[in-house]
């Protein structure tokens, strides 16, 4: 049976009492629809945050996620939105090349091992 990392992330977010909308579809300026694993609502402290929790954290994931994000954020309504990627480091460290690529694009990366510590600060309203 295939396990989805996003399901494990959802369980951890629930245990941290972080509220989110799961499986959000957003149409980009290309007219393609892009799926995001989680949406964290805008608040007085944070902009709207879109979040991906990919099963793999590699070059292909970077390309897939960044195309969808670039297309999504070009909409003027989402100009101030941010992207967060939660990486699965439970069995192996996050791939350095993918980590660097996301950071070079201004994407916040949260390793799963740090999620319990960082979620209440960075993802809660």
Identify the function of each model-found stretch.
Residues 10-30:
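A short acidic/basic microdomain associated with nuclease active sites
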Residues 53-58:
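Glycine-rich phosphate-binding "P-loop"
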Residues 32-35:
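A short, glycine/Asx- and small/polar-enriched loop/turn
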Residues 1, 7-11, 15, 59-125:
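Charged, structured surface patches that assemble and position nucleic-acid processing machinery
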């Amino acid at each position: 049976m295939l396990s989805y990392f996003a399901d494990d992330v959802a369980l951890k977010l629930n245990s941290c009492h972080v509220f989110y909308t799961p499986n959000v579809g957003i149409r980009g300026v290309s007219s393609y629809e892009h799926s995001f694993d989680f949406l964290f609502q805008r608040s007085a402290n944070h902009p709207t945050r879109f979040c991906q929790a990919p099963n793999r954290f590699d070059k292909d994931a970077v390309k897939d996620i960044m195309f969808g994000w670039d297309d999504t954020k070009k909409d003027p309504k989402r100009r101030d939105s941010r992207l967060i990627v939660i990486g699965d480091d439970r069995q192996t460290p996050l791939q350095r090349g993918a980590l660097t690529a996301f950071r070079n694009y201004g994407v916040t990366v949260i390793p799963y091992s740090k999620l319990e510590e960082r979620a209440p600060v960075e993802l809660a309203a």
